[in-house]
């Protein structure tokens, strides 16, 4: 994991109310204070903005400016998903671990495995 993501994870932890985060002084603490519904709403907004930036970039012929807008919006989306992870006491390492678990497994194999696991769970 990059140092930037690790440091951001540490900042997020420090902004939790239990760790002294102040909603009056910190945007992150304010999101934590509002709860997961507010965080999820923000993720939805950022996901929509990411989709729109990508569509705009495609329509603009992938200019440098349009590509930069996509990166900007994805950064917002990643940031807010990291807020959610922290809110649920998860870390970027948890996500990296899941990605590592999937490495070398095709998407079709992954989907088939999930269906099999769901069927097994329903039959138990």
UniProtKB/Swiss-Prot annotation:
It is found in: Cytoplasm. Its EC number is 3.6.1.31. It holds the Pfam family PRA-PH. Keywords: Amino-acid biosynthesis, ATP-binding, Cytoplasm, Histidine biosynthesis, Hydrolase, Nucleotide-binding. It catalyses: 1-(5-phospho-beta-D-ribosyl)-ATP + H2O = 1-(5-phospho-beta-D-ribosyl)-5'-AMP + diphosphate + H(+). GO terms for molecular function: ATP binding; phosphoribosyl-ATP diphosphatase activity. CDD domains: NTP-PPase_HisIE_like. Belongs to the PRA-PH family. This is Phosphoribosyl-ATP pyrophosphatase. It comes from Ralstonia pickettii (strain 12J).
